[in-house]
């Protein structure tokens, strides 16, 4: 067997005796914790300017309701409250038509909703004379769309 080497106790060196690399490491400031990825601090110079908030695009039928109103009664206006009610009314009607046409497509085991399902849904959802006018206007709009 090989003889064991004697272990010498490590001598503690003073700050002056330590190598230059260790002194450089000691001169550095303590390591700062990095902020989490989600919490970035804005630069100091940008703190003076206020950040513009992006608006959510809320789609409404207000401009179209107003155009139809001016076609029918050019001299009459509409309040914002009444406009909100009309917008809600149109959203509700479209929701009912979409649900009904979806049911019709499902009953017929069709994967798509065509103009035929929409037309049948209009006849089922809207009453009497209103359904007839809606169907005729819808057919007119579809033929105009396909011809152009």
From Swiss-Prot:
Q: Name one GO molecular function term.
A: structural constituent of chromatin
Q: Which residues carry this modification: N6,N6-dimethyllysine?
A: 13
Q: Write down any Gene Ontology CC term.
A: extracellular region
Asked whether the keyword DNA repair is assigned, the reply is: no
User: Which positions bear N,N-dimethylalanine?
Assistant: 2
Residue numbers of N,N,N-trimethylalanine PTMs: 2
PTM note says:
Can be acetylated to form H2BK6ac, H2BK33ac and H2BK34ac. Mono-, di- or trimethylated at the N-terminus to form H2BA1me1/2/3. H2BA1me2 may be acetylated to form H2BA1me2K6ac.
- Cross-link type Glycyl lysine isopeptide (Lys-Gly) (interchain with G-Cter in ubiquitin), placed at 144
Looking up Gene3D superfamilies in the UniProt record yields: Histone, subunit A
Chain positions covered by the region annotation Disordered: 1-56
Say where the protein is mainly found.
Answer: nucleus
Basic and acidic residues composition-biased segments: 1-35
**Record PTM N6-acetyllysine, positions in chain:** 7, 12, 28, 33, 39-40
The protein's assembly and partners: The nucleosome is a histone octamer containing two molecules each of H2A, H2B, H3 and H4 assembled in one H3-H4 heterotetramer and two H2A-H2B heterodimers. The octamer wraps approximately 147 bp of DNA. Interacts with AHL27.
Function recorded in the entry: Core component of nucleosome. Nucleosomes wrap and compact DNA into chromatin, limiting DNA accessibility to the cellular machineries which require DNA as a template. Histones thereby play a central role in transcription regulation, DNA repair, DNA replication and chromosomal stability. DNA accessibility is regulated via a complex set of post-translational modifications of histones, also called histone code, and nucleosome remodeling.
**The protein's name:** Histone H2B.1
From which lineage does this chain's organism come?
Eukaryota, Viridiplantae, Streptophyta, Embryophyta, Tracheophyta
């Amino acid at each position: 067997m090989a003889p064991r080497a004697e272990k010498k106790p490590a001598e503690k060196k003073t700050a002056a005796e330590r190598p230059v690399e260790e002194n450089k490491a000691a001169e550095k400031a303590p390591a700062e914790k990095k902020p989490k990825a989600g919490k970035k601090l804005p630069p100091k110079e940008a703190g003076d300017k206020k950040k513009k908030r992006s608006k959510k695009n809320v789609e409404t039928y207000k401009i179209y309701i107003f155009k139809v109103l001016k076609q029918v009664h050019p001299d009459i206006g509409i309040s914002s409250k009444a406009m909100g009610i009309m917008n809600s009314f149109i959203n509700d009607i479209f929701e009912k038509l979409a649900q009904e046409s979806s049911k019709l497509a499902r009953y017929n085991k069709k994967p798509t909703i065509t103009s035929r399902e929409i037309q049948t849904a209009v006849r089922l959802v809207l009453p009497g004379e209103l359904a007839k006018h809606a169907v005729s206007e819808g057919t007119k709009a579809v033929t105009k769309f396909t011809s152009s």
